[in-house]
Every structure is written in structure tokens, then in C-alpha cells.
Amino acid sequence: MKSKRLIGLLLHTALPVWAFSQIKGTIVDIHQQPVEGATIVMQLPDSTYLEATISAADGTFMLKPEPESYQLIVQHLLYQTRQIKGRAHDVGIITLEPKDYNLEEVVIKGERPLVKVEDGRLGYDLSVLSEKRAVNNAYEAISKLPGVQESNGTLSLAGASSLTIVMNGKPTTMTADQLETLLRNTPVDRVEKAEVIYSAPPELHVRGAVINVVMKRSNDYSFQGELSTYYQNRYFSSGGANGNLRLSTPKVTLDVMYGADNAKIMEYTDLFSRHTLGDKVYEITQNEKLSTKSWMHNVRTALEYNINEKNRLNIAYTGSFTPDRNGRSIADGSFQQSTLDKFTENKMHNIAVQYSSGFGLELGGDYTRFTSDNNQTMLTQLTDNSENAYTLTGGQRIDRYSVYADQKHSLPNNWGIGYGVSYLYTKNYDFQTYNNVTGNIKPENTDAKLEEQTTNFYFSLSKNWATGTSFTVSATGEYYTIGNYHKWAVYPQASLTYLKSPQHIFQLSLSTDKTYPGYWDMQSSVTYLNGYSEIQGTPGLRPMTNYNLNGNYILKQKYIVGLFYKHTSDYFAQSPYQATDRLALIYKNTNWNYMRMIGANIIVPFSMGNWYDARLTLVGMQARQKCDQFFDIPFDRKKWIFVGTLDNTFKVGKNLSFELTGNVQTPFIQGTLDLASTFNLTAGMKWNFAKDKCTFTARCSDIFNSSMPDMKVRFKGQYLDMNSSFYTRTVSLNFTYRFGGYWWLAHFSRFCHLQIIDIQQYYEAMYRDTNP
């Protein structure tokens, strides 16, 4: 025992000794009233305990040690715990958020804010938003954020012309689909928060609206894991399994993930075309059935290494493999009967490296390799007994390299500046070769190589006031080249957050952006879908330029009212066109003059007791779409659209909850297309059991098969009807098992008051762990 005491004494005396200066601050609630009796624990960044104290009646506190950098843990029975990192001797005002607490017969009620605003970012705790909802991964939780809507696998944000997802505030060379796959395999409890940003700051190296998914960092000794499996029925039955492991110490955190999915999809489309060719009108009916089956394997390994308390290194590998994707399209109608078989193999590898320093410098690099090989066979029999047929061998090779460097400086009086540079190089190779071609079709072989380079450099200026008001302005210069196309551009960005009080927050943001077309869209190629429909490439397709102005008013950190204006020059979209020289339905991306949208949105959460929570989201806007060069039928169209979503959550007991979500959208337009109204009703349940180690969820999405709009064209002689609202109802079951936990030594009582641990016991325990 004496030797253990001596070891504890030696270790204790080996701790750094600081001058007798003091760390001070003030604890207040959301009404700026002092909080008495809050426990403040001071630690080093590696979680080494230093000292603890209690806030006084006026909310003030003082701590004697003053290390170069530290973290404070602030706790109180009636408020949510906060963790703050600092370097200054005066940490200023620390605001605590209230929480609900059930203490035997006494119920102390507090209301958790829906959103927290910091530096112009709307921060949401995903674990809180999804704790009662039937969500099974980070992607599904993001789709439940206020103002966010998912449609056909694409996320959109009310008031934004486009939406980009990033992880940990840094860019990636993975595509949106590849990032979605990663998030669908990421547990919700690995995410610290999601930040909604209407005007992304330049250090994110993306522009426009962004959702930044911030992953949790661990400074404790722990081993945690999660195993899950799911079943899904959407005409076909599908399923999969996923495993996640995390091993963490104050120095190193290792994450490993593997998932396997057996996906089977059925799509069905009814088409009626009244096709005018010369002086004759042909009525063409067609039913198309597309089935796809595949296995997908996803793997990710991420290592975070804390070099010291100031420097951190992150390395991650992500892989996605689809070795045997088989698809068959069968079209049967009055004009033709066709069968198209397609076999595809896809592989994706991504490596990302990030380094963060203690003096504001961040460096990073990212590489993605994507390969796709496909073989197609098509046979078409026309009503005049002629045949069209071909076999095709094609593929795509993409290499993307990205590097960036960012630097921030803190100036006196809470001013700040930032500057940085990024470079993206992409090499793309597309090819397709037709063989055994017969009939009245003239396919062209394609062998195209494209090199794309994007260089960005930026400068930003920011200011924060003690009241919480802040603003940031920046300008990003960009030099972009693809093939023989070269373009210089400047993108301004600005955001202002005015905090009259925590109950009244105003936001204003301006952003500009460019969206570039896909590589395949710019090829002079034709892809035959069947004997009537085809997709044409568009050489010379120009990028679209987006201008966005957003304003938000946030009341009581819950209710959000927003106004927005969006103008997009050279907007491009794919719209159908009935050819005038032959019986063919052409799908082709074309540049419009512009698309303009102006509107408003409102988000209203409400609840009744502890058993019912709901959120109402309403969006109304007018769109104007103009194109002078859409084949031979230019258009200039306007349309009002309204979207309403009501999320309902019913809590039955502590561990069981049900949800019911309804979404309705009024008719809309896309070029010459008229889109009918849609309605989506989804029901689900969530059951936690085995001391919250197990979770079972069940959900039925799109109960009435009405989430896909009927489409029609009635414009300048074009007459077309398309109905794809088949087989969209989806039933899914998910089971998740969580295991592991913390090996840490600090203990807190059930009432969140610190239990003082003798320093000898602390080091004795550490000695036992390291010397078994």
C-alpha cells in the first residue's frame, strides 16, 4: 500500500504547476439570470482532472489553475451539461439550457430548445431529434431535420436551391450517392450534431446551403459497438446487416464499419404519347417494368490520433463495392416490344487525411477512385415486324484528387480573419462500344477523356459581439477548367446573426454558387432505353450559376419563419420532347435562361404533456422558368407551389413510441412538364428494451402509393402522359444491438453532482489498469 501511495504521490507531483492566477466566468440561464450551484470541473484537453468548484449566488465561479489550454464541464440538476474548451483566463458568460427531470414524486419541467444558433449555423442534436422516432442511421436522422425533405433519395432544404452534405466541416471527393451510403451505415449516436447553414463559409470549400454532420470525438477509454439487421419489402423483399466498432483512448480513436445489403427494386411506368409526325398523329401506349437486383458491400475504417493537446490527425478509408448489379427493363405497348438487360459492376475507394493544429491551421487531402463496367443487350420488335437490336460494352473510370489548406486568426475585440486555398483535379474516362447492331438505329461509339481542374482561394472577415450577434463576409476566387473551357469567377458570401435575446434571433445570408453538369451529360452520345425512348448527351452544356438570399427569424429557439429568393442562370434539367422527324421520345439536358423562386417557410413545433410531440412545416413559393432554346418550343412559365408536412410522435411509456408523418405537395412544373399533386403518409414505431441496448423499429412508408406525381405535357403540340406511382409503398423492420461502454474513472452521482475522488485512488486505479 505504501508503494502505491508513493506512486500516486510521484505521479501527482509530476503534474504541471501553474502560477496562482485564476480562471473565472459566469453561469446564466437562457433568460440571462445567474445560475447558483452549478458544478464546474476543469480538465486538461486529454481529460486529466485539475479542479472543481460550485457557482455562487450571482453565477460566478473561480478556479485557481490556469493551464495553457483546458476544458470545463458544467453541470446542474435542472440544466443540460455543457463542455467548453478554452485558453483565456476569463471564459465569459456560459449559458445553460433547461431540461426535464423526473425526481421521484417531484417533476421539474424544462423545455429543450429545438435549435441552437452559433456563428450563423443552426445546430441540432440528432440524438435528441431521433430518440423517439423510427430512424436507424445518421442519414434517416438528417432527413428528419426541420425544413429538410427527402424525395426519391434526394435531400432538399426549404428555401435553398441546392443542398450539400459534408462531414466534420471538410470537403470530400465522394459523390452525393456515395456519401449517402456512408451515412446510411453510420449509427446516430456517433453524430454529435448536425449544422444547417444557408450560406456556407469558405473554409467548408463548398457553396450554397450545407448540412455539416459533426461526428463525436472521444477522450475516454471505451470500447463500443453496434450490430444491426433489417428487412424491407417494396414489391421485392430485401435485407442487410451492418456492424460498427469503436475503440477509443484519450490519444487514439479507431472506428471500423462493415455493411452488406441485398437490394431488389421494381419500378413500373405507364406512358401514353399522342405523337404528331407531319400531318399524322400516332397514339402510342407503353408499359415499362424495370427490375434491379444487386449486392452492395460497404466498409470504412477511420483513425483519429491526438498528437498532443493542440494537434490532431485523422485518416479514413471508405470503400463501396457492387459486384453484380443486374437490371432488366421490359417495355410492352402499341408501338414496340423491347427487352433491355444490363449488367454492372461498380467499385469505389476513398482515402481522406486531415490535420488540425493548435494555431488555426488545417490541412487535408482526399482521393477517390471509381470504376464502373457494364454490358447491355437490347432487342426491340416494332409493330411493322422490323427489329432493332444491339449489344453494348461500356464503362467509366474516375480519379479525383483534392487538397486544401485553411488558416484562421483571432484578432482583438473578437474580430477574426481566415484565408485558404484548395485544388481539385478530376480525370474521367468514358467509353461505350456497340456491336451486333441491326435495324433502324444508329448508335455511336464513345471514347472520351476529360480532365477537370478547380482552384479556389478565399479571404474571410468575421466579428462576434458579447451579446451573441455575429457576422461574416468572404470572397472566393475560382479558376475552373474542363477540356477547352476556362473560366474565372468570384463568389461573395455574407451572413449576419442578430441576437436581440436568446428568445429572438434574426439571420440573413447571401450565397453564390456554380453547379456543373455530369461528365456523361456532356458527351455526344445516345443511350437507347427501349424502342421509343432515348437519352441524348449535350456537348457544350454550361454550368448553372445560383444566387441565394435567405432570412430567418427564430423565436424561443423553436419557431422558425423564413423568407427566400433564388435565381439560377443557365439552369439545366432533363425534360422529355417528342421528336418532329421520327417517332422517338428524347430526354435531354438543356440550358434554360433562368429559374427563379421566391417564397416563405414556417416551422412550428408543439407538444402536449410528455406523450405527444409534433412539428408542422409549411412552404409556399412561386417559380418562374424560362428557356428560349428548348428544341423548337421555347417556354416561359410561372407556378405557385405549396408544401406541408406534419410530423407526429406519440410516446407510450418510457421505451415505446409511435410516429405518423404526412406530407402534401400541390401541382408544380418542370420545363414543359406538369407535375400533379402528391401525398405521402408514413407510420412507424420504435421500441427500446434490454436497458436500451436493443432497439426494434418498424415503418411503412408511402402507405397509399401516392408519393410520386403523375406527369403530363400539354404544350405547343406536345402531348404526353406518364405515371410512375407504382410499388412505392415500403415496409421495413430493423433490429439494433449495442454493446460496450466506458472504462473511465470519473464518477458522477445520479443528481449530476461531482463525487470527489481521492487522488491516490485515482492513480492506484490507473496503475492497476496499466500494470495488471
Locate predicted features.
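N-terminal periplasmic accessory domains that precede
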Residues: 92-95, 138-141, 179-181, 195-196, ...
